[in-house]
A protein has these predicted regions:
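Non-heme Fe(II)/2-oxoglutarate
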Residues: 1-68, 78
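Catalytic core of non-heme Fe(II) oxygenases with the double-stranded beta-helix
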Residues: 56, 60-165
Length: 165
């Protein structure tokens, strides 16, 4: 089931995470598809709750609301001109948190989810600060382009999960 939740975190926690992400030292040259030509900024957070640091509040809220085990978490970022490939994730469920509280709808940068045969987009979820997206990991999906009018970094926090037994 594909769903999204606005105002996922309490406002003051969302603001704190937004500020913390602006201080991250990003690493460039990550590809969402092995051997892919399109790269983006990325920072691996870890495989367990103890490695999440400042971003543990997001996971705590996810685990309070959903019955999934975190396999790994990481940060992704894009700017205008960087368009990741359509790809599928491993695991059972993917959670993407949008932290930028100042993001404008006309900047784009949402997430498109495609049908299994890649005949079309079934869901387009716009980027909105403090929004959590949840979708089955095997569905093809892609971060959407950022407008050339945007001079900000489109950031997200990603959690790859498996169903708890």
């Amino acid at each position: 089931m594909i769903e999204f939740t606005d105002n996922f975190l309490e406002e003051h926690i969302a603001q704190l995470i937004d500020m913390q992400l602006r201080e991250v030292s990003w690493k460039y040259d990550y590809d969402s598809v092995k051997g892919g030509t399109n790269k983006h900024w990325h920072l691996f957070l870890g495989h367990n709750i103890g490695e999440l640091g400042d971003f543990v509040a997001i996971w705590n809220q996810i685990s309070n609301n959903y019955n999934y085990k975190m396999e790994r978490a990481y940060l992704n970022a894009h700017t205008h001109g960087i368009e990741p490939h359509i790809h599928r994730d491993d695991g059972d469920m993917t959670f993407i948190y949008y932290p930028r509280m100042d993001w404008r709808i006309d900047w784009g940068g949402g997430t498109a989810i495609y049908d299994n045969d890649l005949n079309g987009i079934t869901h387009h979820i716009s980027y909105k600060g403090n929004r959590l997206i949840k979708f089955p990991a095997n569905l093809p999906h892609q971060a959407q382009p950022v407008s050339r009018e945007c001079y900000q970094l489109r950031t997200c926090v990603v959690f790859k999960t498996t169903r708890k037994k």
